[in-house]
Swiss-Prot record:
Name used for this protein in its record: Biotin synthase
Cofactors named for this entry: [4Fe-4S] cluster; [2Fe-2S] cluster
Family membership: Belongs to the radical SAM superfamily. Biotin synthase family.
UniProt pathway annotation: Cofactor biosynthesis; biotin biosynthesis; biotin from 7,8-diaminononanoate: step 2/2
Keywords associated with the record: 2Fe-2S, 4Fe-4S, Biotin biosynthesis, Iron, Iron-sulfur, Metal-binding, S-adenosyl-L-methionine, Transferase
Enzyme class, first EC level, given as a word: transferase
Length: 346
């Protein structure tokens, strides 16, 4: 494999300082070298264990330290999770992501998590999980169960990180990513824009991600969703152009990674989302609520796809078929139908 040069902070800062139109042009050129610009990967995310998290992430309504009105729930039954996965597949998703509000999974829960992964894979969906810190053995067990992706975000730069989280170190996050990679699972890791960070911090986050031994296959870029009761509830809104700029820099720095629009898409108008796709975003969460924050309704997503001429990307998975792909493509190319949206809203 050819040596991949490491990025420097000054190089990344220069990208952020480029005139926006020049930056978008460069990002779109890079994007077209590695991806079909009309294809977007579609995922659904389910919270399989909600609330009562012992961590103190200042942005998160799931932390037990903040009064956000979120009711804590135990780990969902395996069949409940698989039923949600079936609905996600019927609605057109090709990847099903399962998130649990834990510092780390308990050993007693591992057999259930393995069954969830196996069940999702048996449907022909890609399986992704985000469960907090993992041990080497836990990462290997999930890999053996067939897990495709593991999400563990770095959130922000190492320098700003201590202002947001104190219950888990930055190095712990990097260690988990290494364990996931060593187990043979693809890495999903990104961060959040709007925490109160500077442009230098955004550059520092992307620098960490791009300079990993192997960059993440998937890079979610979140816009802070301000939740009443969390310490960041009164943060300033993120300027749309600043967010688009972050997407473009991520695309240039990690040309073969999927750059995903994740939390915060509900706050974006169609024009902002469209410019994010121009900047190189090529993955979204579709439909179901994004953990505990709103996600645009399916029909709005489909309408936007039609307006922009975008298509959901087909995903080759074991034991799968393309039924969900055909459903979604049909919905994208034809007017809304009761049959499709009843299926999507089940």
């Amino acid at each position: 494999m050819a040596h991949r040069p490491r990025w420097t902070l000054s190089q990344v800062t220069e990208l952020f300082e480029k005139p926006l139109l020049d930056l978008l042009f460069e990002a779109q050129q890079v994007h077209r070298q590695h991806f079909d610009p009309r294809q977007v990967q579609v995922s659904t995310l389910l919270s399989i264990k909600t609330g009562a998290c012992p961590e103190d992430c200042k942005y998160c309504p799931q932390s037990s330290r903040y009064k956000t009105g979120l009711e804590a729930e135990r780990l969902m039954e395996v069949e409940q999770v698989l039923e949600s996965a079936r609905k996600a597949k019927a609605a057109g998703s090709t990847r099903f992501c399962m998130g649990a509000a834990w510092k780390n999974p308990h050993e007693r829960d591992m057999p259930y998590l393995e069954q969830m992964v196996q069940g999702v894979k048996a449907m022909g969906l890609e399986a992704c999980m985000t469960l907090g810190t993992l041990s080497e053995s836990q990462a290997q067990r999930l890999a053996n169960a067939g897990l495709d992706y593991y999400n563990h975000n770095l959130d922000t730069s190492p320098e700003f990180y201590g202002n947001i989280i104190t219950t888990r170190t930055y190095q712990e996050r990097l260690d988990t990513l290494e364990k996931v990679r060593d187990a043979g699972i693809k890495v999903c890791s990104g961060g959040i824009v709007g925490l109160g960070e500077t442009v230098k911090d955004r550059a520092g986050l992307l620098l960490q991600l791009a300079n990993l031994p192997t960059p993440p296959e998937s890079v979610p870029i979140n816009m802070l969703v301000k939740v009443k009761g969390t310490p960041l509830a009164d943060n300033d809104d993120v300027d749309a152009f600043d967010f688009i700029r972050t997407i473009a820099v991520a695309r240039i720095m990690m040309p073969t990674s999927y750059v995903r629009l994740s939390a915060g898409r509900e706050q974006m108008n169609e024009q902002t989302q469209a410019m994010c796709f121009v900047a190189g975003a090529n993955s979204i969460f579709y439909g179901c609520k994004l953990l505990t924050t709103p996600n645009p309704e399916e029909d709005k997503d489909l309408q936007l796809f039609r307006k922009l001429g975008l298509n959901p990307q087909q995903t080759a998975v074991l034991a799968g078929d393309n039924e969900q792909q055909q459903r979604l493509e049909q919905a994208l190319m034809t007017p809304d139908t009761d049959e499709y949206y009843n299926a999507a809203a089940l």
